[in-house]
Regions:
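Glycine-centered positions within short beta-strands or beta-hairpins
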Residues: 74, 357-358
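Dual-mode signal for accessory low-complexity, basic/Gly-rich regions
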Residues: 345-346, 361-437, 441-446, 512-525
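Bacterial signal peptide processing site
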Residues: 15-17
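Hard-cation-handling environments
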Residues: 352
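Active-site bordering "gate/hinge" segments
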Residues: 23-344, 364, 482, 492-575
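Sec-dependent N-terminal signal peptides
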Residues: 1-6
């Protein structure tokens, strides 16, 4: 695991009484940032990095680029942040091995002009990850069948809060509202299907940077032509080890993590930022959880996310299994969730307290996003109706839906993403847990398409169709209790995915080089009072962005103290 920094946590533990961590000297892994992420300036400079990438058949939430065979034609569906230099290099490397590649922008798939797409993007991406509270705005705009009444409800109650979440400079003209509608996943899916029908020579598409389940579903009945995500489209990711990591090592790490779940009757999670939660499971819950846990790079480590759907096949991934997994009996969480980061960015520390029934009972702190959550907890019908496939004893929306593990040791905090208002890439790193509140259902029984019962229910009552209000935790300890063995197993230890240290995993990794290097995390966040000098409660929790920005500036200047592997003594510029 490399060097570990010992930090005295007495002061940091003050005010976080829900943490089970003892206020004594507890060791957490020291900060890191990859030292090898040097900016390329030409396609020739990028090619040595992408040639292994285009042969790798294992990818996040789908296949890697290597699943395309010589003589075939595939299409890269490009998002708005894709960098021409990087995409051009990946295309050339694919064509070197005999695969023809088409490049099509998302906006082209749905008949939107480049000018309109750029205008829409500039208005909607009017914030960075410094404004993590904007996840609350995205939750409304992306998840409600009719967002405008929800915005109006909030403006009537809290006009000050509505102005922060939905400022006038982000309002769309009727023309740009049409653009927005066309660029939503369901319509993009229809556009890509039309494209594939017009181009039968194209085997399939690489599309998107996350949400593989949703992307495949929106391509129905052509989901088999979703080949995988197109993640490595920017200078940060392409110079990383994300796309070239040995797939069999990654798969074995995930297999070892999932193995105990069918035998689990209890789990606990603690984290030095204040999370302390636990849950009990009966045999039916454990069985369904074990069958639905898998998604490559994103393990569903709480039964609620693994159910209400057809689970992924581990052997034939990304194909679905044949068995629909019921949501009930619902898994019930107890305790407190705490953190300072969501999928959009950073915010003052919050605590989410769950009732004995596993429902969100109280939210403390969180700044603007905390205020938003407290308000939206009072939305009409959101607490008094049972969602489809939920028992009447489980009315309401505000349950814990997601505890998901990242599993890739070389994933990292991507600064391009932070510029664009997304902290999503970091959640892929092994041992990082991301948590999500709410309810969604992917499928109805017997049909592997989007749940029509969910769509009908949420349309009738104008309720959210998906989960949201995420929290990222980085130094968690996640333990499960085995029912028949009466033994505890630690799956994450202070942010370290323990399967990375499994003897079988290390033996396999040794075939590719030094297992210590291959299985090491190359990025870890710097958090004062936890793994860096300072006081968590005063130096970090009220304004985490301050620390993050300091790290960004040092990395970009080439002067960061925690480059890993250690950088050359001379400072380097990233050209960012």
């Amino acid at each position: 695991m490399g060097a570990i920094v010992a930090i005295m946590l007495y002061a940091a533990a003050c005010g976080r009484s829900n943490s089970s961590e003892s206020p004594t000297a507890i060791q957490y892994p020291e900060p890191r940032y990859p030292s090898y992420l040097k900016p390329p300036t030409s396609i020739d400079e990028v090619l040595p990095h992408v040639r292994p990438l285009v042969r790798n058949k294992t990818g996040f939430q789908g296949g890697g680029l290597g699943v395309a065979q010589p003589g075939e034609t595939v299409t890269f569906v490009l998002g708005p942040e894709a960098e021409d230099l990087i995409v051009g290099a990946v295309k050339r490397a694919m064509e070197e091995r005999g695969v023809h590649v088409n490049l099509v922008n998302e906006y082209e798939m749905v008949g939107v002009s480049r000018a309109d797409a750029l205008e829409y993007r500039n208005i909607r991406r009017s914030y960075t990850s410094e404004q993590g509270y904007m996840e609350a705005a995205t939750w409304v705009e992306a998840n409600f069948p009719r967002p405008d009444p929800v915005k109006a409800w909030l403006r009537e109650r809290r006009p000050d809060l509505a102005d922060k979440l939905f400022p006038k400079n982000r309002e769309l003209s009727p023309r740009l509202r049409e653009v927005q509608e066309k660029l939503l996943w369901p319509n993009l899916g229809k556009g890509i299907q039309a494209y594939l029908k017009q181009h039968p020579e194209v085997r399939g598409v690489f599309w998107g940077k996350g949400g593989g389940t949703f992307l495949r579903r929106n391509l129905h009945p052509m989901e088999d032509r979703f080949l995988g995500l197109f993640v490595v489209d920017n200078r940060w990711d392409v110079m990383s080890m994300l796309g070239t990591y040995p797939g069999d090592v990654w798969q074995l790490v995930e297999d070892q993590t999932m193995e105990p779940l069918i035998h689990v009757d209890k789990m606990t999670v603690t984290d030095p930022e204040g999370t302390n939660v636990w849950a009990d499971f009966n045999e039916e819950q454990a069985r369904n959880w074990a069958r639905g846990v898998y998604q490559r790079g994103h393990l569903y480590m709480f039964p609620n996310q693994a159910t209400g759907r057809f689970g992924y096949s581990v052997v034939e991934y990304p194909a679905f299994q044949k068995e629909w997994l019921p949501r009930e009996p619902l898994a019930v969480i107890h305790g407190t969730l705490a953190g300072t980061v969501n999928h959009t960015g950073f915010f003052p520390r919050w605590e989410i307290h769950f009732t004995d029934n596993g429902y969100v009972g109280e939210v403390k702190g969180g700044g603007v996003v905390g205020e938003a959550l407290r308000e939206y907890m009072q939305l009409p019908h959101i607490n008094d109706l049972a969602y489809p496939f939920h028992n009447e004893t489980h009315k309401g929306y505000w349950y814990l839906y997601e505890i998901a593990f990242g599993t890739h040791p070389k994933a990292f905090r991507n600064f391009t993403g932070l510029d664009e208002g997304t902290a999503i890439p970091e959640r892929l790193r092994s041992g990082v847990i991301h948590w999500g509140l709410g309810i969604t259902l992917h499928h109805d029984p017997g049909v592997q398409t989007q749940s029509q019962k969910l769509l009908d229910f949420t349309a009738e009552y104008n309720l959210p169709r998906d989960h949201g209000f995420h929290t990222h935790t980085y130094f968690s300890t996640y333990r499960v209790h085995l029912r028949n063995a009466d033994r505890w197993v630690t799956l994450i230890d202070r942010g370290r995915l323990t399967s990375l240290d499994n003897a079988e995993v290390r033996a396999l990794a040794s075939r590719y080089g030094n297992p210590d290097q291959l299985l090491a995390e190359d990025w870890r966040p710097e958090i004062p009072g936890i793994n860096a000098p300072g006081n968590y409660d005063t130096d970090y929790a009220p304004d985490p962005w301050r620390t993050v920005k300091l790290v960004i500036d040092k990395v970009l200047a080439g002067t960061y103290e925690h480059f890993y592997p250690p950088a050359a003594a001379a400072p380097r510029s990233t050209g960012h």
